């Protein structure tokens, strides 16, 4: 699976500088991270709806779209697939592959990365309340 995502990532990088009039990927890069995030969220919702409805074939199709849009967002943010695999390995080493790390105050070892200085800090969203839009 990681090979497929790596190939997709490389294809996304190659397509980002193509003509936005003919390349969906280039168009997403032209529109920026907000549009990329919106497309990613839309695909995630479609996967959830299809899963709840029991439409396995649609879940597969929409999951492929979700992974494509996630890969585009990764490329825009300077995240490489191997960065994600390294984090998954770190989590597996700590808790096992089937566990999600808690968001609590648990101190976790930092992963060394040559690009750490270029990344924006992660901001915790816990404790925030959702506002209704009118």
Swiss-Prot record:
Transmembrane segments: none
Alphabetized InterPro entries for the sequence: HisE, PRib-ATP_PPHydrolase-like
The keyword Cytoplasm is annotated on this UniProt entry: yes
Pathway(s) this gene product operates in, as recorded in its UniProt entry: Amino-acid biosynthesis; L-histidine biosynthesis; L-histidine from 5-phospho-alpha-D-ribose 1-diphosphate: step 2/9
KW Nucleotide-binding (keyword) present: yes
Single GO MF annotation: phosphoribosyl-ATP diphosphatase activity
Subcellular location, record wording: Cytoplasm
Keyword terms: Amino-acid biosynthesis, ATP-binding, Cytoplasm, Histidine biosynthesis, Hydrolase, Nucleotide-binding
Pfam families: PRA-PH (PF01503)
Name this protein carries in UniProt: Phosphoribosyl-ATP pyrophosphatase 2
Protein encoded by which gene: hisE2
Lineage: Bacteria, Pseudomonadati, Pseudomonadota, Alphaproteobacteria, Hyphomicrobiales
SUPFAM superfamilies per record: all-alpha NTP pyrophosphatases (SSF101386)
């Amino acid at each position: 699976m990681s090979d497929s995502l790596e190939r997709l990532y490389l294809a996304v990088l190659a397509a980002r500088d193509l003509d936005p009039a003919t390349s969906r990927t280039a168009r997403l890069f032209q529109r920026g991270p907000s549009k990329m995030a919106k497309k990613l969220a839309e695909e995630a919702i479609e996967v959830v709806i299809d899963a709840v409805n029991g439409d396995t074939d649609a879940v597969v199709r929409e999951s492929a779209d979700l992974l494509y849009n996630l890969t585009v967002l990764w490329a825009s943010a300077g995240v490489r697939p191997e960065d994600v695999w390294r984090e998954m390995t770190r989590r597996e080493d700590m808790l096992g592959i089937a566990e999600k790390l808690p968001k609590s105050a648990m101190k976790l070892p930092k992963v060394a990365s040559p690009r750490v200085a270029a990344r924006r800090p992660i901001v915790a969203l816990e404790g925030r309340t959702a506002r209704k839009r009118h």
